[in-house]
Amino acid sequence: MRNIRLIVAYDGTDLAGYQKQPADKGITVQGALEKALSIICAEPIQIYGASRTDAGVHARFQVCAFQTSGSIPVENIPRATIAHLPKDIVVTEAVEIPLDWKPRHNIFGKEYIYSIYNREIADPMGQRYHWHVKKPLDVEAMRQAGKALEGKHDFSTLKGANTTPVDPVKTIYAIGIKEKAGRIDISVVGDGFLYHMVRNIAGLLVDIGLGRKSVAQIPELLAAKDRKRIGKTAPAQGLVLEEIFFTTDRLHAVIECIKEE
């Protein structure tokens, strides 16, 4: 038996999320990968992912793993899957790893990027990949708010509504914001995230950028542990799973890069 780790990228616009769903719910990343790999490995394949992205969310660096008794050379897997996957899902890398390696247990953190287009007139070329916010945003206030969210906190206020109870205490290592030509990219690096947490962070930062809430309110909002204290969840299309970290060296390098911006 062999254990294979994949790096997978996808445009989530027309996908029903990562996790496999009934066929009538639409194409999912997990479902499409299992179908393609079962064909090229000539046996039923079950795949495990590191992050269950929602419908409409994109990924540049999703991590998956599967076990197979098939003999296909690992370096051939990315090319072999092309004919069997939708055009919006691509396997960019495949490597053989120890049998006990699991995607959700052998990583040190994740980076998400949420993109906003902040101009009155929409950009039709990018609307699949950002949230269009027409009113001018105070980016400096958003940066200050990002810094206030860094650290280890109970993020119950920023979780999705009506979600399964899980440990709400997470650590955000860094939040950075880049602004160029109307595009605002919010990078969030942490040890893990609650359902809708990054999109709710983006929504909160936009509310602060619009003056609806203030940076000074953040400690109070977190202490309330009440999802109803913040505004709407930012739309899915602006979110990208940018990277998943296998090593602390790479994690620390990205954190330092964000903090130096």
Model-predicted regions and their roles:
Residues M1-E261:
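Structured-RNA-binding interfaces characteristic of tRNA pseudouridine synthases
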